[in-house]
Amino acid sequence: MTKRLSPHEKKNRKPASRACVFCHEKHLQCSNERPCKNCVKRGLAHECRDVIRKRAKYLNTNSRRGSEAQAHADYPHNPIDGFMSPTIKPEIPSPASNMVVSPQFVGNALLQQEVQHPQQFHPQQQQKLSLHNSMLNTTNDVLNRLLEEQNFKDTDSDNMSANSVNASRPNTAIGTGTFSSNYLNEEYLMLGDIILHSKPTSPSPSNTSVSEYNTNTVSPNFSSQINYDDLNQPRRKVLQRLKDSRPFISLGFSNESSQLPNLNSSNIAQSSSIPTEYVSPLVTHHLYQSVQDIYTNNIMNFDYPQSYHSLTHFLKKRFSGNNLPAEQKQAKRQSLLVILKLIASYRPTFISAHKSLLKPYDLQFLEMTFQRCLIDYEKLSQLNSSPTIIWRRTGEIVSITDDLLSLLGYNLADLLSHRTFIMELMYDDESITNYFRLFKTVAVGNLHSSIITKIKLTKNQNRNVSDQTGTRRLSYELSERDHIEFCSVWTVKRDMFDLPMMIIGQFLPILPAGDGVRMY
């Protein structure tokens, strides 16, 4: 039995750089001198020598590899082990972020290059890997089975050496079968999707998508060089093989996941290169008269950036103050600065939400949602007696009822045949400033869906008084003024990103009191 060390000795002792064989086997504290103290006490001084450490795998020499391969030559050749070797990795240069990506770095280029490399691996290295990894862990087992299927069953362009590898492959392939564990089946499916769709050098969708607020775009030839059919094909094959053999609830994919739309390179290129033409609300009313028309016709994306540019141009023109005294011109300039500050408060949120969209599919979905809601609210406005105007979050009018057109003296074509903003109908600058101040309160954060306010709307200066409806006294009093004051209630309809998508404004005119009307 060894002597117990005192606390002072334990504090002053230093660990040996390498223990001897006896101390290593008995788990004793060895010393640096040879023979060590433990071996001298036990009369084993002549046998005291340093223990031989195991060499790391990457330090093994070629002769050592050759000897081990000679000793274990009876093990079958497994090309998948060579494929999963951690020491041989085909180098793929990653391009800079500001360079045009070559098509060889896109899609399944990594998988294609690795499929061509197994016949170039050293056979001794593969046999050594099969020796040391006789009991594979779960992840390696899943990857081996998946890659074995993909590389040797779904590849038609292999050369003669790859065919010989297929002939010598052992009969342990799973074919269309699955693992005995449901958890392994789930991991098999998830890892397969990661491998088949891994694009380490491809840019993210946020970089490749065309944003209206960012001028840095990818070269137009980039999307035309991507073969999207090759990207979708392996996923369909894997899901088709495992679709009928998974009796448990799928956590990664649904049954409809194999029916994903084909991402055609020509469609992507056309949608990103062709600018969106403006379609007036009067035209869209004829195109989408029912819900079936929305799903049968091609939805035309609404260009929100261009609408904001037109709004900015209108505000600058409205508040320019030309041919006005210096004081009034300065007051208009101050009102314009207030409006621009209000727009700048919620503009970053709108930009960040737009950048996360997958263009043009998300834009089409949002426009379909808008047109679908517009049909419902137009039907509701026909059943409601209050005059109604519906406009987008940019302020562009998309619908107006006939009774409000009659009050203001406009025709439907005057407002909906071109881009018309709700601010253009406002009589004074105070109403416009108040509009943006109220819109800011519901644009971001505050999810209140209604606003109650007063507003002045201007009437058509070229209106025909004989076309006005109502009593003679009411028509006369309305015709004498160039604007009408309304009590207005706004209902805000939001999209899937909680941004204001549509504003439904109901306007009740404040009529002048007659002789027999009591004022409270």
Curated annotation (Swiss-Prot):
GO terms for biological process: cellular response to starvation. Residues 376-445 form the PAS domain. GO terms for molecular function: DNA-binding transcription factor activity, RNA polymerase II-specific; RNA polymerase II transcription regulatory region sequence-specific DNA binding; zinc ion binding. It is found in: Nucleus. The keyword Nucleus applies. Gene3D superfamilies: Zn(2)-C6 fungal-type DNA-binding domain. Pfam families: PAS_13, Zn_clus. It comes from the Eukaryota. GO terms for cellular component: nucleus. The keyword Nucleotide-binding does not apply. Residues 20-48 bind DNA. Transcription factor which regulates nonfermentable carbon utilization. PANTHER family: GLUCOSE STARVATION MODULATOR PROTEIN 1, ZN(II)2CYS6 TRANSCRIPTION FACTOR (EUROFUNG)-RELATED. Belongs to the ERT1/acuK family. This is Glucose starvation modulator protein 1. The lineage of its organism: Eukaryota, Fungi, Dikarya, Ascomycota, Saccharomycotina.
